[in-house]
Design a protein with these regions (language model features):
Chain A
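N-terminal small-residue-enriched
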Residues: 1-119
């Protein structure tokens, strides 16, 4: 899938976080992986912020989002209208081939997700 | 501009010399001219039948230009002298734009290279229809063990490589390798992997790989959900080879310099338990990844990366060695991911212990046996925090014995912790190399205490 993204919604980013009393904004991520059934996935925030009463406040270190794919998508309750994309490469093989991809989309809000880390 | 296109023996002999002449004319002080000629034959198969057969003839000239405090390298796919000239003209402004570093020079030859036996088998370049027979034997062996579907890839490699430098190096070598990696399914959630890798046909065992893969698939039927926590884990050769590849990369001066190493500032320190001795043995007889010289013409060495738990050797090429005021370890390697020659270990050997796999289960008591993985990703390269996803066969260990299969778990830990918590290493090693194991690695099973295991929260 070289050019797949989530359909944008009708809220601004500020509206997306505006009614969050206590949450986390994962802007970018570092560690990530997914199993071969695409069922279990994990993302560890790289640049991430605490959301308090609708405002981004302090930096959050290494928040871990580890959940199933159905849980992820069923927890989405709002999607922003702004979209951002980057060029990327997806490894395919065997033998190794780099497939150019366009990756990104809108900001997405998930409700009642547990963030954790470590065993 | 006159152009010459060469092929075969004359290409291997003459093109490196022509690169050096042209580099000198362009004003470079240190020049490496190299050419690699590879024939690769691949047979892919899925759902028990062959789906793709493909042959590649890949010829890759390599140009390295050194200007004292700056250097640049390029790998081409065009063997004409016009392409070499054009590439050098493109490299000159690029190298001038680089920041200056410590002055360094490529190794001064000539060198006497060690003869490493078993790196070439004349039967491998002649393999054609036999590759299909090998695939068939692997599939049949897997099905006989109880698999229903078998997929994978079998590839043979024949590589000829020559190198000529402005400092008196004149080297050439011929290498072969044949490898198979297959995955068998007994049901959708019951799978197993099998691998065989060798430089020669006599040690290549596709049927054995098929048996292993099919057997794991059958044993994995009806897996239960595993539990998160700290578990004693017996790692199979495939997953532990993947983890050791990250150890080898961390031992590279390039990774340390770039901030991608969990071994930074740890030279001479304990980074693992007494059980961990990892060698980059580029002179190992019949070792996939072994080669008598590196991409600067420096003779290969046997380097103890980690010796009884102590980080003993940083892998260097001439540039990184000059920067850290030490000597090259003979690891200069063209690294296609970044398009540079950097120091990289290429032939990993983990010291063996004296226990069997079953002894490790007994020592583990209660825990997990994980055979394979994919997607090892670092949260923090400097600290070594990472996670990786077990795939294919995974089992509980109960009361020191192999228990029922489980699924749905993730290894979420730290590489230094993994090395320091290594309690035992088995005897009975095998070579591993596949999609997730880029650097060939020779190892057995490994028992690690209290490994972090996580699972999805919902």
């Amino acid at each position: 899938m070289a050019n797949t993204y989530m359909k944008p919604g009708d809220q601004t980013f500020d509206e997306l976080i505006g009614d969050i009393r206590h949450g986390v904004y994962l802007k970018t991520f570092m560690e990530w992986n997914i199993d071969d059934k695409r069922f279990n996935e994990r993302y560890v925030g790289h640049e991430a912020y605490l959301i308090e009463n609708g405002e981004l406040t302090s930096y959050v270190r290494n928040p871990v989002l580890e959940l199933t794919t159905p849980k992820l998508y069923s927890s989405v309750d709002a999607v922003s209208k702004e979209m951002e994309f980057d060029a990327g490469t997806c490894g395919k093989g065997d033998p190794m081939q780099g497939a150019p991809v366009y990756e990104g989309g809108p900001s997405v809000r998930l409700r009642n997700i547990r963030l954790g880390g470590g065993a | 501009m006159q152009t010459t296109v060469q092929s075969g023996e004359s290409l291997l002999r003459d093109l490196p010399r022509q690169i050096v002449q042209r580099g000198a004319k362009a004003g470079a002080g240190d020049i490496v001219g190299g050419v690699e000629v590879e024939k690769r034959r691949m047979v892919r198969f899925s759902n028990n039948v062959v789906t793709v057969v493909q042959t590649w003839d890949i010829t890759s000239p390599i140009i390295y230009l050194g200007f004292g405090t700056r250097s640049i390298a390029s790998r081409l796919s065009d063997t004409s002298t016009a392409a070499v000239d054009e590439s050098i003209q493109q490299m000159l402004p690029a190298v001038n734009a680089l920041p200056e570093t410590v002055e360094s020079h490529i190794p001064r030859g000539p060198f006497q290279y060690k003869n490493v036996p078993g790196l070439f088998d004349s039967k491998v370049p002649r393999l054609e229809a036999e590759l299909m027979d090998m695939v068939e034997s692997a599939i049949n062996a897997s099905l006989a063990e109880g698999a229903k579907r078998v997929s994978g890839v079998l590839t043979s490699y024949h590589t000829r490589k020559s190198l000529y430098t402005s400092t008196g190096v004149d080297a050439s070598t011929e290498l072969t390798m044949v490898e198979v990696s297959l995955r068998s399914f007994a049901e959708d959630d019951a799978s197993g992997q099998g691998v065989s890798v060798s430089t020669s046909l006599k040690d290549f065992d596709p049927e054995g790989a098929g048996r292993e893969s099919g057997s794991f698939a059958k044993q994995s039927l009806h897996p239960g959900q595993g539990h998160e926590g700290k578990h004693n884990v017996v790692f199979g050769p495939s997953i532990f080879a993947n983890l050791l590849n990250t150890v080898a990369f961390s031992a590279s001066a390039y990774a340390i310099d770039a901030g991608y190493s969990f071994f930074a500032d740890k030279l001479g320190q304990k980074v693992g338990s007494e059980q961990v001795t990892l060698v980059d043995d580029r002179l190992r007889p019949a070792g996939p990844g072994a080669i008598p010289f590196d991409d600067e013409g420096h003779p290969s060495q046997t380097n103890n990366l980690v010796a009884k738990g102590t980080f003993e050797t940083v892998s260097h090429d001439s540039r990184t060695a000059a920067k850290l005021k030490t000597r090259s370890t003979g690891n200069a390697t063209w690294f296609s991911d970044i398009g540079q020659i950097v120091p990289i270990p290429t032939c990993l050997v983990l010291d063996e212990g004296d226990r069997s796999r079953e002894d490790l289960f007994e020592e583990a008591g209660d825990g997990l046996y994980i055979t394979n993985n994919w997607y090892t990703r670092f949260q923090n390269y400097r600290t070594g925090d990472f996670s990786t996803i077990p795939r294919d066969a995974m089992f509980l260990i109960r009361n020191g014995k192999l228990g029922p299969p489980v699924k749905g778990l993730r290894v979420s830990d730290n590489m230094i912790h993994i090395l320091q918590s290594t309690r035992a290493v088995s005897r009975g090693r095998k070579w591993m190399r596949w999609w997730e194991v880029d650097i060939p690695t020779y190892l057995g099973h490994v028992l690690v205490d209290r490994v972090g295991i996580t699972r999805s929260t919902g």
